[in-house]
Design a protein with these regions (language model features):
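Elongated, non-catalytic scaffold/linker segments and compositionally distinctive motifs
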Residues: 6-8, 37
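Flexible, surface-exposed loop/linker segments and immediately adjacent secondary-structure boundaries
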Residues: 24-213
Length: 213
């Protein structure tokens, strides 16, 4: 089986035939599992709606609207959930199903997200990074939430371990620990979150019940 390899620095292969230029199709890296309200993706300047079973492509700019949610699963089993008014791009995806290890770089431009790790993390992780507006998050065997909350930006680990690299400080979070970043960009020391903050974080990426339920 051919490994799925997409890199941030990769250039498109161009084929020129009869004075026309054929550009390689974008590579599929996953598919949509669930959608609430309006969610779309932009690829090479073209916007398309994301629906259940829609393909997710390398370098798609996935965006959720007001009261929207998106849940997608990548080819290695990594699961990504977006809250409302969120934007995310997969900048690097290297995965070989025969050797379950590779590299994943996710850029969260805005909004709340939930990341549930897949096979790319392998035995040690360390090759999965999530870049947020205020910090870089190194992931190991992890379920992690991040997003704007309580007038700052929060990161909370539900399982596994992450390293949060902000301005002038790096913090390691283990299961049940979170951190907050405010205007100074310095992550606070790891600590359990208050119940109210935790509830708001979970609500930000939770799908609403369908009508009639």
């Amino acid at each position: 089986m051919v490994p799925a390899i997409c890199r941030f620095s990769a250039s498109l292969a161009l084929g020129i035939f009869s004075a026309s230029v054929a550009v390689a199709e974008p590579m599929t890296v996953g598919a949509v599992d669930k959608v609430q309200a309006h969610v779309d993706a932009t690829q090479a300047g073209q916007v398309r709606p994301l629906l259940i079973n829609s393909d997710v492509y390398f370098r798609d700019r996935c965006h959720s609207g007001e009261d929207a949610r998106l849940q997608a699963t990548l080819k290695d089993g990594t699961q990504l959930t977006l809250g409302e008014n969120a934007t995310l791009v997969i900048d690097e995806f290297v995965y070989d199903p025969i050797r379950p290890r590779g590299k994943l770089l996710i850029r969260v431009i805005k909004g709340a997200f939930l990341y549930v790790g897949g096979l790319i993390e392998g035995e040690t992780g360390a090759k999965v990074w999530i870049q947020t507006p205020v910090a870089a998050i190194g992931v190991r065997g992890t379920t992690v939430w991040g997003g704007p909350i309580d007038n700052g930006y929060g990161v909370i680990v539900l399982s596994g371990e992450v390293t949060v690299i902000g301005k002038k400080r790096t913090v390691t979070l283990k299961q049940g620990q979170g951190t907050m970043l405010f205007k100074d960009g310095k992550p606070q020391r790891a600590a359990a979150w208050p119940a109210g903050r935790m509830k708001r974080a979970v609500a930000s990426i939770t799908f609403g019940k369908p009508p009639g339920q």
